[in-house]
Amino acid sequence: MEQKRAHGVTPGLNKDYTRRKAEHQAAFVLPYLKPGMNLLDVGCGPGTITLGLADRVKPGPVTGIDHDKINIESAEKIAVKKNITNVSFRMADAFTLPFKENSFDAVFENNLFVHLSDRAIDSAREIFRVLKNGGFFAARDADADSVVWGNQNETLKEFDKIFYLWQQSRGSEITIGKKLPVILREAGFINTIKTVSADTKGDPESVKSHAGIIISLLEGPLKKFIVDNNLGDSFFLGYLKENFISWGEHPDSFFANVHVEVIGWKQT
């Protein structure tokens, strides 16, 4: 089964994915990692977080899986460039993991479940299956109900509503973060620990880059959704883009995407 991304695939968004690092997106799980662990990263994307995890558990093996061939190829190239040898990448489906039961000491996912929506529980159960007894699963997903826009205006609020409808139409659930404790518990995990962090665009360069990502969506897949669903015309689209250009250049602008983080254990 092909798993859709929570956003349209644009060059700007792909570049943004490569900026993600274990030191931030996986900070909540780093204290639990030990050298020699066998770790799986489900929905690894371009692998930049995976490589950071591999550094923490070396010489233990780390496997990154993703349904996107381009992501896997990108991850492999970065691993070679950084000379990280205890990591491997492969294409795989999050619902039918190609591993035996009790294979891994730890499993990690960052913003995978937003893509899977109500099937996230199926993936969580597969993750439970491949974990060793006593192993843990660390899940981190966004919750768009808690998005913070610095220098927000009414147009940005309107964009948020449209963006939510678009994701919903694609089968994505961008408010799934708050449901992670329930998902992990129903999949069989115990003793869950919950924390919250945010992916923030706060410096002028990252703010302008984030505005550019949104503009590229408005010129691509989101444009079609708006027009097809009579949510706006070409004038409205132009107005949105002009607002994001101005927002991206304003000194008070920032963006924070709040994420819920949950670690759960498989009983020994």
Give the ranges of each region predicted by the language model.
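Class I SAM-dependent methyltransferase Rossmann-like catalytic core
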Residues: M1-A22
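C-terminal helical/coil "lid" or tail adjacent to the Rossmann-like core of SAM-dependent
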Residues: Q3, P11, I193-F254
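Conserved alpha-helix/loop element of class I SAM-dependent methyltransferases that forms part
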Residues: R19-M37, G52, R56
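Class I SAM-dependent methyltransferase SAM/SAH-binding core
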Residues: L40, P46-T96, I121-D122
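A short acidic, Gly/Pro-enriched loop at the edge of an enzyme's catalytic core
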Residues: F95-V107
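A short SAM/SAH-binding and catalytic strip from SAM-dependent methyltransferases
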Residues: D105-A120
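A short glycine-rich, Lys/Arg-flanked "PGG" loop and its adjoining helix->strand segment in the class I
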Residues: I121-F136
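Conserved catalytic/acceptor-binding region of the Class I
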Residues: A138-V207
